[in-house]
Amino acid sequence: MDAVWEARWTMATAEECRKALETLTGRLSEMGPEDRAAHLVDRDISCRVTDLGLTFLTRLGSGGAGPVTETTGGGPPAQVRFTTKSDDLLTIAADPGSFARAWLTGRLKIEASVFDLLRLRKLL
C-alpha cells in the first residue's frame, strides 16, 4: 500500500479538516495575481467530510480564497462540491500531488460544471 494512503487508526477531527482546507486554499495565495485572475472565477466551494458528517464552505475568486467555515447547509448548493473522508482530506492537503490520485481512485468526488473542472485542472 502506498505510504501516503496508509490508514490511520482514528479519523481526523473537524479542526484538523478545517486546517487542511485552509492549507489547500492557502496555496492559492502563492499564485501571482495574474495567474489567479486568469484561472479563478468567483465560486462557492464546499467540502463534505462524510465520516464526520460535516460540510465546510469557502469562496474562491481572483483575490484568493475566503475563510473556511463549517456550514449546516440550508443555503443554495456550492458551484463546486468535493466529497471525501477526513483522513483522505488530510492526505490531499499534505501532498499536493495526491489530489488527482484521490479523485482517480474514488477517494475524492467532485461535482462541478465542465467549465469549473477545466479551471480546477489548471490549478491542481
Region roles according to the model:
Residues 1-124:
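Feature captures hydrophobic
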